[in-house]
UniProtKB/Swiss-Prot annotation:
Record's keyword annotation contains Kinase: yes
Keywords: ATP-binding, Cytoplasm, Kinase, Magnesium, Metal-binding, Nucleotide-binding, Transferase
Source species of the chain: Azobacteroides pseudotrichonymphae genomovar. CFP2
Family: Belongs to the acetokinase family.
Taxonomic lineage of the native organism: Bacteria, Pseudomonadati, Bacteroidota, Bacteroidia, Bacteroidales
Example of a GO MF term: acetate kinase activity
Name of the protein described by the UniProt record: Acetate kinase
Highest taxon in the source lineage: Bacteria
EC numbers for this chain: 2.7.2.1
Subunit structure comment from the entry: Homodimer.
Localization, UniProt: Cytoplasm
Site positions for Transition state stabilizer: H180, R241
Length: 397
């Protein structure tokens, strides 16, 4: 069975075509700068070589059509006809309270995703555009929606409710939703497979640390709490997002700077986090380089960054009444051993010990805890696209 996975962003589309029987990737790439000057499709050939194909891609339908044309082309294709694609799986960012699992897409599902646009105005519209494009271009092909938020719908109410008037929840569905759910679900399951441990009997803390970052507490296979909130701004210090902040600071800044909601949103989403505190970059690799030459703001940024992650690990150890497995994933979590080391330093009292030599491995599935560590510490490169493909396969079955 062949499954195409699409991840449609505001000006981009990432794609992977899987052969599920062979568990292999037949094609992968992405369209960039949709609706902008200089749009192009970048694809990765089986030998690893990158190819860039320029073209005028004005909207998502054109982008999806371009992708379908490439994967069936004589020069770069891997299939002869679109009829070989058995289903299309879509990443959908926000399912609100309407979806607690992946679903086959029909008119009713599309209507409900549309109703969630208020909760993710930048993400759900392009996700829908991808769905509409496939409806038009491959009308007989089943589609599946896999939601970033669905995994966290198992959180208890005392974990997802905010201390605001209850009427605001009733009117506007203001609550914690959490994100990166597909990633947390994939890496936590994969970690248990690596360790030959039952997923349904473990207390797992999953750290997805990249430009966006979140920590999730998973008990017996379900999410019980997560650091991101109603929006992806809450929680950890991220590339350009501030993370946890006293809400009173926002009104204070608005008054002092004489700015409105749009400007304050830009500050907390685009100008804060690692970039804001360091004044250097949103990329932790560049922060590491600056630390090497003694840059004080870079050192402070790294301290804030790792301290916040440690706080969440501590809090979630309490929420889970212990911890069996700690998982690192995401661009930083998978590749920056110094950050992993700094996070784990001082956590011996809860049973976390990591092997310094093994921890130096980058970007590979690795057990980095020592043999006598009570808590297993695992690095798992995330694969959200494969998880989407697995969900799609499961629903078709």
């Amino acid at each position: 069975m062949k499954i195409l996975v699409l991840n449609c962003g505001s000006s981009s589309i990432k794609y992977k075509l899987f052969d599920m029987k062979a568990k292999s990737i037949l094609a992968q790439g992405g369209v960039e700068k949709i609706g902008l000057t200089g749009s192009f499709l970048k694809l990765t050939l089986p030998n690893g070589k990158k190819v860039i194909l320029e073209g005028e891609i004005l909207e998502h339908r054109t982008g999806v059509e371009y992708i379908l044309g490439v994967i069936t082309s004589e020069k770069y294709g891997c299939i002869r006809s679109l009829s070989e694609i058995d289903a299309v799986g879509h990443r959908v960012v926000h399912g609100g309270e309407k979806f607690n699992s992946s679903v086959l897409i029909d008119d009713e599902v599309i209507r409900k995703i549309t109703e969630c646009i208020d909760l993710a105005p930048l993400h759900n519209p392009p996700n829908l555009n991808g769905i509409y494009a496939v409806v038009e271009l491959m009308p007989s092909t089943p589609q599946v929606g896999v939601f970033d938020t669905a995994f966290h719908q198992t959180m208890p109410d005392f974990a997802y409710m905010y201390g605001l008037p209850y009427s605001l929840y009733e009117k506007y569905a203001i609550r914690r939703y959490g994100f990166h759910g597909t990633s947390h679900r994939y890496v936590s399951k994969r970690a248990c497979e690596m360790l030959y441990m039952s997923y349904e009997r473990q207390r797992i803390i999953s750290c997805h640390i990249g430009n966006g970052a979140s920590v999730t507490a998973i008990k017996n296979g379900i999410s019980v709490d997560t650091s991101m909130g109603m929006t992806p701004v809450e929680g950890l210090l991220m590339g350009t997002r501030c993370g946890d902040i006293d809400a009173g600071i926002l009104t204070y800044i608005m008054e002092k700077e004489n700015i409105g909601t749009s400007a304050i949103s830009t500050i907390i989403n685009k100008c804060s986090g690692v970039l804001g505190t360091s004044g250097i970059s949103s990329d932790m690799r560049e922060i590491d380089d600056a630390i090497e030459i003694g840059n004080k703001k870079a050192i402070l940024t790294s301290d804030i960054y790792t301290y916040k992650i440690k706080k969440y690990i501590g809090a979630y150890t309490v929420a889970l009444e212990g911890i069996d497995i700690l998982v690192f994933t995401g661009g930083v979590g998978e590749n920056q051993f110094r950050i992993r080391q700094k996070i784990c330093d001082g956590l011996e009292f809860i049973g976390i010990k990591i092997d310094e030599a093994t921890n130096h491995i980058r970007g590979k599935e690795t057990i980095i805890s020592t043999t006598d560590s009570k808590v297993k510490v695992v690095v798992v490169p995330t694969d959200e696209e494969f998880m989407i493909a697995l969900d799609t396969l499961s629903l078709l079955s």
